[in-house]
Regions:
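Catalytic cores of nucleic-acid endonucleases
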Residues: 70-135
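Active-site metal-binding core of divalent-cation-utilizing nuclease and nuclease-like domains
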Residues: 22-60
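C-terminal helix of von Willebrand factor
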Residues: 158-175
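Conserved catalytic cores of phosphodiester-cleaving nucleases, focusing on short active-site segments
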Residues: 54-56, 64-70
Length: 176
């Protein structure tokens, strides 16, 4: 099932890549495959950590991981997806010619949240999100993990061009 914000983020990143690297999309982003991350280079059920929404591969290595949340803001979900991705070391999928794609030396993890759905008046979710981003960035890199940077963006739906551009700019900067 395709999700509007997922597609908008994928389109922004595809535009920013402009032929540099490969954007791999899950079905919610308009792709055709799930994007499983594993610990190690052998595909097994016990080493599968999670599926993510978008990956950017450059030079045969995963350089950017993107997770998009359209349904709400739960700190356990936000932190859990980040930690599972940080524990993982490879993207493995049968559709790839490589048996496994390792993470690069410096990987950016991006979380995009639909602010139009999770930033309701009277809540402190925006402050909580900034605190989570600040705290995660302060502990990076985690020992044994290639994720060296973390960014969180609240995008106010598919029409928030400035928000989408911020996501694209952060990814472009990380790949420069």
């Amino acid at each position: 099932m395709v999700h509007p914000l997922h597609v908008a983020v994928a389109e922004e990143l595809q535009h920013r890549l402009a032929g540099r690297g490969e954007l791999i999309k899950d079905p919610a982003c308009g792709g055709t495959q799930y994007l499983p991350l594993f610990v190690g280079d052998i595909k097994r059920r016990d080493t599968r950590m999670c599926d993510v929404d978008l990956l950017i591969v450059l030079g045969g290595r995963v350089m950017v991981i993107v997770e998009i949340e359209e349904s709400g803001f739960l700190p356990t979900k936000i932190c859990g997806k980040f930690l599972q991705s940080a524990i993982a070391t490879h993207f493995i999928h049968d559709s790839r010619p490589e048996s496994a794609l390792p993470y690069g030396k410096c990987v950016l993890f991006v979380q995009v949240l639909d602010g139009s759905k999770c930033l309701k008046p009277g809540t402190q979710k925006d402050k909580q999100g900034r605190l989570i981003e600040e705290k995660i960035r302060s502990i990076l890199p985690l020992k044994g993990s290639s994720i060296t940077d973390y960014r969180m963006f609240f995008v106010q739906g598919v029409d928030d061009l400035a928000g989408l551009e911020s996501v694209g700019a952060a990814v472009s900067y990380a790949l420069a």
